[in-house]
Amino acid sequence: MFRSKRSGLVRRLWRSRVVPDREEGSGGGGGVDEDGSLGSRAEPAPRAREGGGCSRSEVRSVAPRRPRDAVGPRGAAIAGRRRRTGGLPRPVSESGAGAGGSPLDVAEPGGPGWLPESDCETVTCCLFSERDAAGAPRDSGDPQARQSPEPEEGGGPRSREARSRLLLLEQELKTVTYSLLKRLKERSLDTLLEAVESRGGVPGGCVLVPRADLRLGGQPAPPQLLLGRLFRWPDLQHAVELKPLCGCHSFTAAADGPTVCCNPYHFSRLCGPESPPPPYSRLSPPDQYKPLDLSDSTLSYTETEATNSLITAPGEFSDASMSPDATKPSHWCSVAYWEHRTRVGRLYAVYDQAVSIFYDLPQGSGFCLGQLNLEQRSESVRRTRSKIGFGILLSKEPDGVWAYNRGEHPIFVNSPTLDAPGGRALVVRKVPPGYSIKVFDFERSGLLQHADAAHGPYDPHSVRISFAKGWGPCYSRQFITSCPCWLEILLNNHR
């Protein structure tokens, strides 16, 4: 029974992996992204289905599905006919068949020509000629058809060689993964399976394994790299791209320690330099994107006042946790939640090293934005709030403050330490799902103390994070107060 249960857990974990989705294509093309930019979308999370012409491959969960090759060319032809006509499957007359083999005879259920219905098939009525034309295979003269990444059935030697190579790589990945998972105890397998099936909603504890000399495709594959690529990021190449979250064993352990945590949801990918999307500045003169100044216009003053009201008048909001007479240890930051220009709820003081800020989380504690009520909310705010999901993990670490995007939609960050030194343009960084970014650098902040302040009110210890919507020169929203849902992180000066 013990061996049987462990084997079942290993098989469930293998079926829960994600693979690049090459069947749906890029899916995006033109159009405006949900963040308001004209650029390509960020790398989607395993459950995200947003399309977008992204350079990275979309990932999807592996679903138990009957492969096309399993029914043979005859079954594939019947399935293709059924998708085009929407009728019942009919037997295909073999070449050289007798007069009794009429193409109008319907196959009996369970017979040789019968193909059972599948929930994964798309049935289109033949009466709708437009849909039939859209679903029909394209002419060979179509350049997009020639660029199809999926080889046709029964292709030439090159396509068969590519398929055989993919099968060999898949088999090698399965062998290496099984060899690693079978080293884990039943409790560790349960923890790992819960984290994978909840998509990080229940990250669970550390899953420690000895540092093994695993190799995949002739390259070293540490446990955290192997499972991170298997369950979260199929395009992950090196372990240095991963950052352990605070509280994980690998966060405090030595880099060459005897054990390492392989829970993929105890790691995040580092957010490197990005190429910004095509700016909206080509539609407007660039002089509009100067730093805010009180003398610019009434709109500039309004936006500046809205985003700095908590700084200029901190005593306006009464919070017992922020009182200097409080006996609690000093908080290292306070979090304010805004919807456009309206602050919702009270300041949330953070005392722990890390805090979760979320809309809906299966397990855990922190700042729940879903419990903050407002009498009148616009439709854009409601839509954006529904995209917050697991939200972010904000942590204070020795080198600075980090934000980890736990949700399924990107977040957008602006911080004094992210701006270019001496630059006048507003820098807003896009953080895809599953990525982390250092939103505040303690070392760089010391240099900002002696730098000349920008025009207008300026707070060197304030970080702004917007959910799902970007702002600034590269987006249609020029100010943070135009974003439906955003956070203001007010860092305590006494660190």
UniProtKB/Swiss-Prot annotation:
User: Which CDD domains does the UniProt entry name for this protein?
Assistant: MH1_SMAD_6, MH2_SMAD_6
- The keyword Phosphoprotein appears for this protein: yes
Q: Where is this cross-link: Glycyl lysine isopeptide (Lys-Gly) (interchain with G-Cter in ubiquitin)?
A: 174
Q: Which residues form a coiled coil?
A: none
Q: Which UniProt keywords apply?
A: Isopeptide bond, Metal-binding, Methylation, Nucleus, Phosphoprotein, Transcription, Transcription regulation, Ubl conjugation, Zinc
**Molecular function terms from GO:** chromatin binding; co-SMAD binding; I-SMAD binding; identical protein binding; metal ion binding; protein sequestering activity; R-SMAD binding; transcription cis-regulatory region binding
Q: Which InterPro entries match?
A: Dwarfin, MAD_homology1_Dwarfin-type, MAD_homology_MH1, SMAD-like_dom_sf, SMAD_dom_Dwarfin-type, SMAD_FHA_dom_sf, SMAD_MH1_sf
Pinpoint the MH2 domain residues: 332-495
As for subcellular location, the record says:
Nucleus
One short Pfam name that applies is MH2
Domain of life the protein comes from: Eukaryota
Q: Region Disordered: what ranges?
A: 1-115, 133-161
**Residues bearing Dimethylated arginine?**
74, 81
Q: Which residues form the MH1 domain?
A: 149-276
GO CC terms on record? ciliary basal body; cytosol; Golgi apparatus; nuclear body; nucleus; protein-containing complex; transcription regulator complex
Known tissue expression:
Ubiquitous in various organs, with higher levels in lung.
Question: Which residues are recorded as binding Zn(2+)?
Answer: 206, 248, 261, 266
Quote the PTM field.
Monoubiquitinated at Lys-174 by the E2/E3 hybrid ubiquitin-protein ligase UBE2O, leading to reduced binding affinity for the activated BMP type I receptor ACVR1/ALK2, thereby enhancing BMP7 and regulating adipocyte differentiation. Ubiquitinated by WWP1. Ubiquitinated by ARK2C, promoting proteasomal degradation, leading to enhance the BMP-Smad signaling.
**Sequence positions bearing Omega-N-methylarginine:** 74, 81
| Induction (UniProt) | By TGF-beta and BMP4.
Protein task: Transforming growth factor-beta superfamily receptors signaling occurs through the Smad family of intracellular mediators. SMAD6 is an inhibitory Smad (i-Smad) that negatively regulates signaling downstream of type I transforming growth factor-beta. Acts as a mediator of TGF-beta and BMP anti-inflammatory activities. Suppresses IL1R-TLR signaling through its direct interaction with PEL1, preventing NF-kappa-B activation, nuclear transport and NF-kappa-B-mediated expression of pro-inflammatory genes.
PANTHER family hit by this protein = MOTHERS AGAINST DECAPENTAPLEGIC HOMOLOG 6, SMAD
Similarity comment: family membership: Belongs to the dwarfin/SMAD family.
Its name, as the record gives it, is Mothers against decapentaplegic homolog 6
Q: Which organism is it from?
A: Mus musculus (Mouse)
